[in-house]
Amino acid sequence: MSASRFIKCVTVGDGAVGKTCMLISYTSNTFPTDYVPTVFDNFSANVVVDGNTVNLGLWDTAGQEDYNRLRPLSYRGADVFILAFSLISKASYENVAKKWIPELRHYAPGVPIILVGTKLDLRDDKQFFIDHPGAVPITTNQGEELKKLIGSPIYIECSSKTQQNVKAVFDAAIKVVLQPPKQKKKKKNKNRCVFL
């Protein structure tokens, strides 16, 4: 095993999409039942992924507009972002490209972004959509299209309530830092002028 490396992972996304629940689910294997905006303390633990031990530092952020000026302070030194939207909220899905990508590109250019669709357990819950007639489910294909649009290397859907794919989200975040995806080579311009 290699020596432990520190990785700073910051979660971002609209308020109430499930960022804090995802962090609590990952770190304590429990699901909080009450919504309390951002009550997750920064967390650090040694994690082994593919034989590599890393010290994973998790930072939660508040998605509400009241925090627009404070939130970017937590971006400094980030190795990877987990950008979350809710699979049952079209507005949070649209804000990925409209709000979050411009903010992250401005304050932390070049830092990889893992795109995550949360609340997977509710997407196929017919009763939820009966109780919330304005809610619009986001499909896996829509998530994949958004991944391409924003240039994210990975898109994962998860449920903090059932813990489906929650560990996969953080494993992917660690892997993208340890083994960054290869950049596509730009094609060389073959039509060059040469003066003799």
Curated annotation (Swiss-Prot):
One of its GO terms (cellular component) is nucleus. GTP binds at residues 16-21, 119-121, 159-161. The keyword Cell membrane applies. Pfam families: Ras. InterPro entries: P-loop_NTPase, Small_GTP-bd, Small_GTPase, Small_GTPase_Rho. One of its GO terms (biological process) is small GTPase-mediated signal transduction. The modification Cysteine methyl ester is found at residue 193. It is a peripheral membrane protein. Disruption phenotype: Fewer and shorter root hairs. A lipid is attached at residue 193 (S-geranylgeranyl cysteine). The keyword Transit peptide does not apply. Residues 194-196 form a propeptide. GO terms for molecular function: GTP binding; GTPase activity; protein kinase binding. Involved in cell polarity control during the actin-dependent tip growth of root hairs, thus regulating root hair length and root hair initiation. Inactive GDP-bound Rho GTPases reside in the cytosol, are found in a complex with Rho GDP-dissociation inhibitors (Rho GDIs), and are released from the GDI protein in order to translocate to membranes upon activation. Belongs to the small GTPase superfamily. Rho family. This is Rac-like GTP-binding protein ARAC5. It comes from Arabidopsis thaliana.
